[in-house]
Each structure stands twice: as C-alpha cells, then as structure tokens.
Amino acid sequence: MFYKMIENKCKEWYNSENCTVRNLIEYIEKTGQMRDAQIEAIKVYLFLKIGCECKPLEFLFRYGCFNSINLNNIELSTATREYLEENPAATALFEYSRLTNDKGEQVSEKLEKQIKKDPSSIDYDAFFRTAFYGVSYTDYLFSLPMGAGKTYLMAAFIYLDLYFALNEPTNPAFAHNFIIFAPSGLKSSVVPSLKTIQNFNPAWIIPEPAATDIKRMISFEVLDQGKTANKSNKTKNPNVQKIANHQPLSELFGLVAVTNAEKVILDRIQEKSGQINMFEESDDEKDRQANELRNLIGKLPSLSIFIDEVHHAVSDEIKLRAVVTKWAQNHTVNSVIGFSGTPYLEKTEKFKVVDSLSVGTD
C-alpha cells in the first residue's frame, strides 16, 4: 500500500511544472514499443530518480515526500493538527493508515485513531526504518505482471540512467554502471537475459542521435566462467579479469555485467541464523578469489544493482543484502533495483507501531 502514496505523488509531479520528462514520456508513448505496465513503471522510476533525487524510500517517507493528504479536510484536535503539520513522518503514517485497498478496506482504522488520540506516542522514524528493513542505500522494487517484459524494462532503466548521466555527469541520482543478477534458480538465465538487453532498441525510449551514441558506449560482460588453472597451477578467476579489463575503474561508464548471484557473487559465503561469514581472512584460495571478485565489483563507480526475481531463496536474500551493504559502505552504490513478476511477500508483514498495535504492509 505504500506504493499507492508513491503513485499518487508521481501523478501529481508528472502534471506539475517541476516535471522535466513529460516530452520524453510522450516520445516513448508515440514510439508504441513499450507496454502500458512498462511505461507506468518508467514514470515512477523517473519520478524517484528526478523528483526524489534517488533517495532511499525510508528517507522519502520520513520527510513527507509522498504526502498528498489535506489535513484541513479532516476532523482533528488542535494539538494533533499542529503535531502533524510539524512532523511530516507522522503525516505520512497518518495518510497511510487512511488508504483503502481494492476491496475498499482501510489499511488501519486503529492506527488512524491512535494518531488522532496521541500522535506523540509513536516513533515514526523508527517505524519507517523498520518497514524498509533498515537499509542505508536506495532500494526500489518493481513488481510487474508476468509477461509484462521485465528484462526490457531493465534495459530501459539502463538507457535512461545513462542518458541523464551523460547530461549531468556529477548528478549522484543517475547510475553509470550496472550489474544484473539473473534468477538464482535458473541455470540458463544469464545469457538469455543478456541477449534480451542487447537486442533492446534504445530509440524506443530515447530520441536519436542520443540512443545510438549511448548504445555504442555500453560494454557487456557475462560473469559466468568457472575458475581456470594456468601452467603454474595457480587458479585464476576469469570473472575478476573481465572487470579488471575496464581499468581505470574510477572513470568507468556504461558497463553492464550480467551474472548469477548464487553462483558468482554469493560464492563462499556462509549464512547461519542470519549471521554472515565471508571468510575474508581465510587462506583458502577459493575464498580469496570469491572475495577478490566481490571487492572489485564494490569499486565500480555509480553502480546500480538490478536483481531479477528478488523473492527466491531467503538464505540467498540475506547473503546478498550483506554483500550489497558492504559495497554501499564504499559509497559507490547508486541504487538497488529489484524486479519481480510475482508479489514479493507471500503474506503481509506486520510492523510494531506501539506496544499494543502493529500494522501490516503489502
């Protein structure tokens, strides 16, 4: 339901004078190559990138960036009204509590009453931090209907980021390099994903000559090769070499790497009861190689990490979040963008608001 607030604000932004991409969206609609669900996702993506400066969702909700509610139309005590007017995070949660789902059911009448009665009883910042898993980096999830063309949407996002990054090279909202994690459970998913992205025609979403210029700048790498031993029996990781070939990494622009996270990025990581061990001090050659690749990817500047089918294995999810969190400490991660063809949560998650009240998010 958080999405409803984002969607409402996106529509408001798109129709306002602040929107700088209306002509671009009209161009995309005119070419007629993208599906409606893809165009809607592109609108939201550009709103988050440009209208919201690619900030983390937790930050955007806490600072009221998605607030659309008019408090003047609601019966409130003077004290509550003043509290909400001075606390955008409180207003955000208040607006969220009043949303209705497709069946017309309110998110939480109890929460609305609690805020009206005693708004200062809730730690709003803590609620939003918990609701978005406490991550410090930008992490957006796009859930599209099955068959709506997720991989083409990834390609569109890549080209759009590079298009704006070329115009504003120092704007931190736009990614310069990309790594795509193909679904873990599918052994043969990496190459088809790459081919689909390579076959994408950027002129469907970006006018010429920019479309062709950007296509020429992109270099693709598949990180799927096993270890190779040279004559000295010293094993090498060819995936490391593929990244290292793009030195100097600090100036790298337009790299699109595709890999299987489970086999490559999460190799040699142990997860037990939520605790992660990357064996960084290990003398084992395989541990060393796995960490060498992870460390190198962590140096790629303005990196956007695309995760296809984010909802698969829970253990892999924990490992992947640990790796991305470590990369984010280098201040090289622009964003993590998840793509799913099915709802991410099998059941509604509940987050505590006050001791006697929890709220579900979906």
Regions inferred by a protein language model and the residue ranges of each:
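Conserved pre-motif I regulatory segment
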Residues: 13-143
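Inter-Walker segment of RecA-like/P-loop motor cores
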Residues: 203-281
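Short, hydrophobic/amphipathic alpha-helical patches that form generic packing surfaces
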Residues: 9, 40-51, 156-164, 168-169, ...
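Conserved Walker A/P-loop ATP-binding site and its immediately adjacent core
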Residues: 153, 172-213, 262-263
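Short linear interaction motifs
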Residues: 20-28, 122-126, 134-138, 232-247, ...
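Signature of the SF2 helicase/ATPase Hel1-core->accessory helical subdomain module
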Residues: 144, 151-166, 187-198, 258-362
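Short loop/turn elements that form and flank the Walker-type P-loop nucleotide-binding site
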Residues: 136, 174-175, 251-252, 299-301, ...
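P-loop NTPase motor catalytic core
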Residues: 115, 119, 131, 135, ...
